[in-house]
Amino acid sequence: MIGKSVPRVDAYDKVTGRAKFTDDLVPANCLVAKIYHAKIGNGIVKSIDTSKAEALDGVVKVVTFKDVPNHCYPTPGHPWSVELAHQDVADRNILTGRVRYYGDDIAAVVAEDEITAQRALHLIEVEYEEYPVEIHPRKSMYGSKPPIHLDKKDNVLVRSNYFIGNVEEGLKESETVIKRSYKTPIVQHCHIENPISCAYMENGRIIVVNSTQIPHIVRRVIGQALGIPWGKIRVIKPYIGGGFGNKQDVLYEPLNAFLTTQVGGRPVKLDITREETFCNTRTRHSIEYDLTAGVDSEGHLLAKDMLAISNQGAYASHGHAIAANGLTAWRLQYACPNIKGEAYTVYTNTPVGGAMRGYGIPQVCFAIECFMDDIAKEIGMDPLEFRKKNLIKGYYEDAYLKPIAANTNGIFECLEKGADYIHWEEKRKEYTNQTGNIRRGVGMSLFSYKTGVWPISLEIAGARMTLNQDGSVGLMLGATEIGQGADTVFSQMTAEVLNMDISDIHIQTVQDTDVTPFDTGAYASRQSFVTGTVVKDCANLLKEKILAYAKELLPEETRKLRLDHGWIMAGKDPAISLGNLALESYYSLGNSSVITAEVSEQVKKNTIATGCCFAEVEVDIKLGKIKILHIINVHDSGKLINPKLAEMQVQGGMSMGMGYGLSEQLILDEKTGRPLNGTLLDYKLMTMMDTPDIKADFVELDDPIGPFGNKALGEPPAIPGAPAIRNAVLHATGVAFNENPLTPQRLIDGFMKAGLI
C-alpha cells in the first residue's frame, strides 16, 4: 500500500458536498457575534459607549475590554512547556483597551442575526488617545514612547544568535568579500475558509466547534485565556477549508468561548470576514536581511554573516521562533567553517506575523539563494557550479542541534534532474548577452527543511485503532486533516502494516478533544513523520493482538499466522476470516475480548528534507512583465507514501511560491498601518490564467529514521520558487532585484535605474 497513488479517502464527500465543515454544523437558532475593531494604529481607548448598540432590537449582549477576564495568554500552536523558559510569550488579551495596531479588538456584539450585529457595531462610540505609529522594524527596534508592550522597552520581542568558527578571520582570509541586503514582504495565507467557530455550553462545560489545525492546543489556550480548568473545555474540529499555518494560531476561539458564557450558554457563531482575515489574523513576516560572505580564489565559502530583522507586528504569536528558525538554514546545506547568524524580532504597529507554510524558511531562502547567485556573478562562476562546489555531500548534522541531520541527502540528484529538465547548460549560454525588449533567462535555487520540531520543542502523537465486528479497522488520531491528504496517508500506513485493503480502514476525520488521542496538530511538515511513527507502532500492536487472539481460537498446529487482506493465514492456507475472528472477539460467551490498540509516544527524532527549483522566464522590460515558461521543483522527501498526493502537494506549494515571487504583498498605510489591499480583489493571488504548467519530480531515498522511509513534504514546495524566478530575471536582464515580489512597478523602477528603459 505504501508507494501507491490511491484516491483520497475524503474525496467523495468533498466533491459531492457531503463533507461537513464548521458552518455546516451551526444550529439554526445560533446567535451571531461580530467584533468592533480599533480605528487607529496605536493608542489607548479613553472612553467607550455601547448604550446605543445595547438598545438596538435583536442585540443580546455587548462586551468590551472592560468585561473580559484579565488573563494574558499565548496564541501560537506550540506544545505547552512545564519549563517557564520554554513557554510561549503571553501578551494577548481577549479584548483590549491598549490599541497596538489598526484593527485591534476592543469590543464584541452578540445578536440574533448577522445584520443586527453589524448595525450594532456602527452604534458603538469610542474615544481614543493616539500615539505615534511605527510600521518599520529597523526604526521600532530603537524603542518608542510608550513601548508597544511595557515589558519590551526597545520593542524587541527576542534576539537570537549563534557563532561557528571566527567570521572576522574568515573574511580577512577571503579573496573576495560580498555584501548584500534583501527584503521579503508581508503576505497572507488566503485559505478558502475564513477562521470560524461556534461555541455553546453543555453540562457546565464550554464546547467550541472550530476550523483549526491544532484542536488540543486550542483547548489549552481557551482555558488559559478564561482562567478556567482545561477539562472544562471541549474542542471539536470538523473538515477544514485550509489553514497554511494561520490556523496554527489560536485566533478568536477564546473570545467565542467567553461570549457563550455571557448569553447563558446559547450557541454563538463567530465567523470573520475576508477583510478581517487579512488584518486581524496572522501573516507571513516581512524580514530584512544583511548578508556578508567571503570566498577564496576557487569559489569556496570561507565565512558567512547574517543579520535578520523581522517585522513581528503588534503581538508575539510565533514570532520568537520564526526568525530563529530561519537562521538555521544559514548554517545548513552549504559547507563553511565560519558562520555567524543574528536575528531580531521586533514589535511594530502592524498586523501580527505568525506561522505560514515554511515557517521562516521562504524568507531566508529568498535571501540566501539570491545571495548565492549574486556571489557567483561577482566571481564569474556559473551559479549551479558555485552551489555544487559548496554543498555538503552525503550525511551531515546541524552543528548546533545535532539530533537534526540529513540522514539521506539527495540534493545532487535533485539538481541533476532539475538542470536536465530546464536544459541549464544550453540556455545559460544561449541567453547570455541579450539585447532588445524581450529577454529570457534561467534561474535556480535550493533549500533544506527540518521534519518536525524536535529537539527544539516537544513532539508527541497518539493513535487508537479498533477491530470492528466486520473485520475492518477504525482509526482515530489527534492529528488533523487540513486538506493536505493526511487521512489518506495514515490510512495507507495502517493498511500497509495490517496487510489490508485501504477500503477496510475507517479513519475518523473529526478531532474531538474529549475523544481523540492527544496530538499537537498539523504544522512543521510533521504529521507523516511524527504521527506516522505512532500510526505504524499502533498498527503493529493491533496486529500482535489480532494474531494472539487467533492463536487462542485455532488448533495448536497452526502457530505461524499472518494477516492477508481480511484473512488469518496459517502458512499458505486461510485459517479464519478477520470478520469471523472479530465476531468471536466481540460476542464469544467463552472468550470475548474486543481487540483495540492505543499508542501515545514522544517522538525524539528529526531529519532534513531537501530539494530545488529551476525556472525559465521571459521578461518584457518595457511592460515590467514576467512570463514563466517552464518551472520544476525536485524534492528529496524520502519514500513517497502516495506519489499522486505528493505531486499535488508540490504543485500547490509551487503556485504559492510563484505568488510570493511575482505578485503577493500586503501593502500598509504608512501613517496608520492599515492594510490597503486587504481583499481578494486587490491582493494579487496567482490565478489559473497566471499559472504555467508546473512540473514536480522526486528523488526517492528511503530515510532510515522515517517510519516508512519518508520525511517532510508539506511545506518545502512553497520555499524555492521565488528566488529561482528572481535569479532567472537576473540572468535574463543582468539586474538584481533584492526585494520580492517582482511586480511590474518594481521591475520598471529597477530597469530604469539600470538604464534598460
Where are these regions (language model features)?
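Glycine-rich loop/linker segments at domain edges
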Residues: 4, 10-13, 82-86, 154-197, ...
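C-terminal catalytic domains of large/alpha subunits in multi-subunit enzymes
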Residues: 65-66, 227-232, 261-268, 297, ...
